[in-house]
Regions:
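Conserved alpha/beta-hydrolase "nucleophile elbow" surrounding the catalytic nucleophile
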Residues: 70
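N-terminal loops that bind phosphate or other acidic moieties
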Residues: 2-66, 75-142
Length: 142
């Protein structure tokens, strides 16, 4: 049986995708190939529709694809919407903990809607208004 490849795309307005990809690569020692799509950076750049189309054309139809987009309903997310399927998962409102968790998920574990949903729910707990949190700081941590 042929191994299914998992593809990772981080897509955003301007350079957020590049920065998040760079940080994930740094923290994971670049163990996974991650594509970054940075829209609306320069005048005269290739239209994002074309970039997305070419990217998906380079993948096998059996590949699993995880798309991390910056904003729900935004113009970047809209370019990935037509590609959504059982094998193409689009997550909006990205953050580092969510992206890391999904990139580090074993490729032996098939991506299901339930699995992706659970990671999204877990990542919501990583967004914290720290002023409202009471915790003791260990002086050894500083």
């Amino acid at each position: 049986m042929e191994k299914i490849l998992r593809r990772y795309i981080i897509a955003s307005h301007h350079k957020l995708a590049y920065g998040l990809k760079d940080t994930v690569d740094f923290l994971t020692n670049g163990i996974k190939k991650i594509y970054d799509v940075n829209a609306y950076v320069e005048d005269g750049e290739k239209p994002i529709e074309e970039v997305v189309s070419e990217l998906f054309a380079s993948f096998d139809e059996n590949d699993e694809v995880l798309v991390f987009a910056d904003m729900m309903g935004g113009s970047v997310y809209q370019k990935f919407y037509p590609y959504m399927s059982d094998k193409v998962h689009v997550v909006c409102g990205i953050n580092l903990p969510l992206t890391l968790a999904l990139v580090l998920e074993s490729e032996d574990t098939p991506l299901t809607q339930e699995l992706v949903h659970q990671y999204v729910e877990d990542s919501k707990n990583q967004i914290v208004y720290v002023n409202e949190v009471n915790f003791a700081v260990d002086e050894d941590d500083e």
